[in-house]
Every structure is written in C-alpha cells, then in structure tokens.
C-alpha cells in the first residue's frame, strides 16, 4: 500500500512540475489550478492573456501586492551616522510585483578642519588654535629644541611655517610662549635650560 501511495505521490509531483514548467502548453486546466493555488498563497495574482502578453487582472479577490522599497546606507555615510542620506520613496504600485523606486540624496560633508587651517595659514599668519599647543609641546622637551624653537619663533615665524603677522592681527599666545621658551632655552648652556623647559 505504501508503494502505491508513494508512486501516486511522485506521479502527482511530476505532473505538477511538468505543468508549471510548460506553463499550460500541455494542459491549460493544470495551469489554472496552479495559478489559483499561487494566488491563495500570495505569490502571484490571476493573469489574463492580453495581446500576447500576460497582465495582472484586477478584481476576483486577488491580493494586492504591497511592497516597500528597502534601501541600504551608502558606504561613505556608514562611517558617520550624522550625515546619513535621507531616502525618499518616489512611487509605488500595488498591481505590479515591485515597481517602487527610491532616490537618495547624499549631502556633502563639511570641510575638514585640517584643510581649513592650511587655508588660514596661506592668508598670512592668522591665529591658529593649534600653534600654541604644538609650540609648547615641542619646545618643552629639552634645551636644544627650546633654543631652536625660540629662534624660529623670534625670527617672525611659527612652528607650522606660517609667515610673520603683517596684516594687523594680534599674535597668538602660542607665539608669545614660544619666544619666552626660546629665551629660557638660551640659558640651557649654563645647565638651567632643562629645568626651565620641563617646568614650562
């Protein structure tokens, strides 16, 4: 009995697969049966032949296919969640399988502060917040660096190579500290420069 049941089951499976692959060329009733089952399962809706092309037929209790367009974040925006691109749903259709389209608009990121500091430096010796920190950190290590830093800063430059302030801007505290540290560094020849440099 089990052999007969398995044989009938395999025959039904083969017949169903044959009808599904052949798309009703051999047996149209089988195709309609499969389409009714698929419409119940929500895979496809009932279709009619219109001018040699299959189109979805409205009505008949067919399920309306509603799908949302799922989008992923751009790789560049994934690094900074603050500038994640907003995705906008343009259009959607319930009759087609998935005719939703999405358009993304990625805002341009703000300029980096490093590039901005170079632009300010090129303008001619404006106060930069990093000059004082760089000068103090480099000049407080030993007497040699103190002497060199003081010579550079006293000659009218600074640690990053900006020209002397000739546009009427006030000198930064980092430049003034560089001159003071340079003067203290000159005393390093007598053995006092190391202590003064570390005391800062």
UniProtKB/Swiss-Prot annotation:
Residues 124-200 are annotated as: Disordered. The keyword Signal applies. The keyword Signal applies. Keywords: Signal. It comes from the Viruses. Residues 184-200 have a biased composition (Acidic residues). Residues 1-24 form the signal peptide. This is Uncharacterized protein DR3. It comes from Human herpesvirus 6B (strain Z29) (HHV-6 variant B).
């Amino acid at each position: 009995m089990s052999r007969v049941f398995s044989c009938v089951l395999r025959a039904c499976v083969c017949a169903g697969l044959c009808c599904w692959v052949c798309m009703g060329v051999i047996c149209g009733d089988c195709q309609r049966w499969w389409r009714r089952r698929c419409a119940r399962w929500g895979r496809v809706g009932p279709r009619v032949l219109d001018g040699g092309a299959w189109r979805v037929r409205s009505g008949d209790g067919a399920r309306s296919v509603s799908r949302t367009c799922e989008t992923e974040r751009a790789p560049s925006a994934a690094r900074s969640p603050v500038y994640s691109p907003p995705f906008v749903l343009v259009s959607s259709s319930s009759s087609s399988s998935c005719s939703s389209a999405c358009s993304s608009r990625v805002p341009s990121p703000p300029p980096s502060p490093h590039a901005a500091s170079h632009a300010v430096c090129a303008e001619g010796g404006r106060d930069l917040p990093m000059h004082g920190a760089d000068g103090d950190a480099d000049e407080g290590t030993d007497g040699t660096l103190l002497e060199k830093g003081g010579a550079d800063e006293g000659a009218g430059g600074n640690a990053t190579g900006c020209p002397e302030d000739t546009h009427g801007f006030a000198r930064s505290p980092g430049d003034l500290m560089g001159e003071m540290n340079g003067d203290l560094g000159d005393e390093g020849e007598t053995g006092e420069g190391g202590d003064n440099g570390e005391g800062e």
